[in-house]
């Protein structure tokens, strides 16, 4: 489906809504996050210690890179995310389906 990367890993989303982390040098799969199974998920976005994905119901999900755990969900209500989020430091910016530019800080995720 789509991918993102950092210095050591690849992050891939697939058609089943799964998010995978692979070692860049060996290709070995290290974890799979299946909480969004059967959702149509966006391309992943790598942000510091997190990977972000959105789904068509209007939520942005935060996954911890270290272990693949889902650590945050930000709901947009009736709006959906259009395109891929843009990252600046710990702030994520995205356009919603109503045409509004929104932002969230992900620094305090656990």
Language-model segments: residues:
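Repeat-blade elements of multi-bladed beta-propeller folds
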Residues: 1-19, 33, 37-61, 80-106
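Histidine/lysine/aspartate-rich catalytic loop segments that bind and position anionic ligands
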Residues: 20, 27
């Amino acid at each position: 489906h789509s991918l993102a990367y950092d210095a050591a890993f690849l992050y891939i989303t697939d058609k089943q809504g799964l998010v995978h982390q692979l070692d860049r040098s060996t290709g070995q799969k290290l974890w799979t996050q299946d909480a969004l199974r059967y959702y149509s998920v966006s391309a992943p976005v790598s942000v510091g210690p997190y990977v972000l994905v959105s789904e068509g119901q209007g939520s942005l999900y935060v996954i911890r890179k270290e272990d693949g755990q889902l650590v945050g969900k930000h709901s947009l209500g009736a709006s959906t995310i259009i395109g891929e989020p843009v990252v600046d430091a710990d702030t994520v910016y995205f356009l919603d389906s109503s045409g509004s530019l929104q932002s969230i800080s992900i620094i305090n995720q656990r």
